[in-house]
Amino acid sequence: MKKFLIALAAVITLVACKSKDDNDTPNQLIGGWKLESITDNNQPKPLTECEKNVIIYSATETEEIFFKDDGTGKCVYDKDASIEKRPYRVRGNIVIATNPAIQQDYPAEFAIEGNKITFKVKATTQSGQTNRVLVFRKLSPQELTEIEKLKNN
């Protein structure tokens, strides 16, 4: 499970960085997005509620928020797994992220339809290379406020 979350964090990191000088970012990207599903090579991956991380995009940065089960079935903020704010950039329908540790760019195709955003990436799993599709749902302002409260507790 931990390897899955690390892989998920890596994939999300790949799609979640932007530079301040990029002016073609769709305004629709800005806001909070909650993971709904992951598909690897057309095979759905089951997710618990606590595995449904949140990405928050501002005009210049993104932040990834992860959760864990507190042992009672309640999802709580996982500070250790969450990723601090990072810059990102967008070119058309491609989000380009840079892994700051190795300075390598990772592109991911994205599409926004209504309140859903879909990312398509090449991911490396234990069984090799996979075509991964991640679908997120846009959070309401109230849901975003609740996420911020979880972070601050």
What are these regions (language model features)?
Residues 1-4, 18-19:
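Positively charged n-region of N-terminal signal peptides that target proteins for export
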Residues 5-10:
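Sec-dependent signal peptide hydrophobic core
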Residues 14-16:
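C-terminal motif of bacterial Sec signal peptides marking the signal peptidase cleavage site
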